[in-house]
A protein has these predicted regions:
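Conserved short N-terminal element of RNA/RNP-binding modules in eukaryotic RBPs
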Residues: 28, 173-174
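Intrinsically disordered, serine/threonine/proline
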Residues: 1-119, 312-314
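A compositional signature for long Ser/Thr(±Pro)-rich, low-complexity
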Residues: 107-110, 135, 142
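A generic structural signal for short, solvent-exposed coil/turn residues
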Residues: 17, 34, 109, 121, ...
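C-terminal cap/substrate-recognition subdomain and adjoining C-terminal extension
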Residues: 41, 48, 129, 140-148, ...
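Short, surface-exposed secondary-structure junctions/capping segments
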Residues: 64-72, 129-138
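Conserved beta-strand elements of beta-rich interaction domains across eukaryotes
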Residues: 15, 30-32, 47-49, 56, ...
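Low-complexity, Pro/Ser/Thr- and charge-rich linker/hinge segments at domain boundaries
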Residues: 117-133
Length: 314
């Protein structure tokens, strides 16, 4: 089992309550060590926090809470979610933060996993982008060719997403790749450059499953929406009741459209791109390109007031 950690999104409500997406952290090489022997330390922006996680025998990290049963005896409850008070103790900056999970073991030594953790206000408007087939030009080849030195990216994607960000929207990235591929995938997104434009920063959400399970769902069964719908539902549930945070979605399959419609993204704000880089805006018959959307940026993605924190996406 491979090690990896997923990016995290924290949403701050007007009442000051913080809610986060799952803390998916996996130390694959430590799965044989008993969980009671392993405490995972958490550092944010290079500073140690008072919050810790505990390692299970499978290598997954959890938060542990005391839970009272009917007979008043205390039971231990495992969770991937910290409380609002715990999130506040992380002392997050608005926007992007670096989070490190550190395991110290006499057997395996010191092991570190790094991810990004974002703090956004509940007024945020989010644009979703799939990675494989949407940023890359192929679901499968897009995972391999960039690491062989070949560009396999749709033309104009970094320029378009940069303009969307400048209009005040936040971007999140989705992939059905396994958490064990997190470092490789983040490196690809972070180093992607087209005509001096890079992809705007934003959390990357992945499959918490193993590589073979993830590949089976993505490539063989072709049902990635079975992952993306609960993933996006979890993100939506971070927002106050009644808030619709998702503004638009980019994908490359009908299953992406199914997931986006399930989350109430309007039909004409769902964009599907094919392997020849032609983009269909659902509800229209004529295909265009990422460049065509860029030229209509003010019409399709009108500027929104981002005065709460104009560095929120940094």
């Amino acid at each position: 089992m491979f090690s990896g950690s997923m990016d995290i999104l924290v949403i701050e409500s007007p009442n000051g309550i913080l809610k986060s997406s799952s803390f998916h952290v996996r130390f694959g090489s430590l799965k044989v060590i008993k969980s009671k022997e392993q405490i995972i330390e958490i550092f944010v922006n290079s500073k140690k926090t008072p919050i810790t996680m505990q390692l299970s025998s499978s290598g997954d990290a959890y938060f542990i809470y005391d839970e009272l049963s009917n007979n008043a005896d205390s039971k231990k409850k495992k969770s991937f979610f910290p409380t609002s008070d715990q999130l506040k103790q992380l002392n997050l900056n608005q926007g992007h933060n670096e989070i490190c999970f550190i395991s110290r073991s006499s057997i395996s030594g010191i092991q570190t996993l790094k991810s990004s953790i974002y703090l956004w206000p509940s007024s945020s408007k989010i644009v979703i982008s799939d990675v494989d087939g949407t940023i890359t030009r192929s679901d499968v080849l897009g995972q391999v060719l960039p690491f062989l030195g070949r560009d396999w990216t749709h033309d104009g994607v970094t320029d378009l997403f940069t303009k969307i960000k400048k209009q005040g929207y936040k971007l999140i990235y989705l992939t059905a790749r396994a958490i064990g591929q997190s470092s490789m995938t983040k490196k690809y997104l972070d180093t992607l450059i087209q005509e001096e434009n890079i992809l705007p920063p934003g959390p990357l959400f992945m499959s918490p499953d193993g590589i073979f399970t993830s590949l089976k769902r993505e490539v063989i069964e072709k049902k990635p929406h079975l992952l993306k719908i609960p993933m996006l539902t979890e993100i939506k549930n971070l927002f106050p009741e009644g808030v619709e945070p998702f503004y638009a979605g980019f994908g490359n399959r009908e299953t992406d459209a199914i997931a986006y419609r399930y989350l109430n993204i309007p039909l004409n704000y769902i964009f599907l791109i094919d392997t020849s880089s032609k983009v269909l805006r659902l509800g229209e018959s004529k295909k265009g390109s990422y460049k065509d959307i860029s030229e209509k940026i003010d019409e399709i993605f009108p500027a929104i007031d981002n005065s709460e924190n104009n560095e929120i996406n940094q």
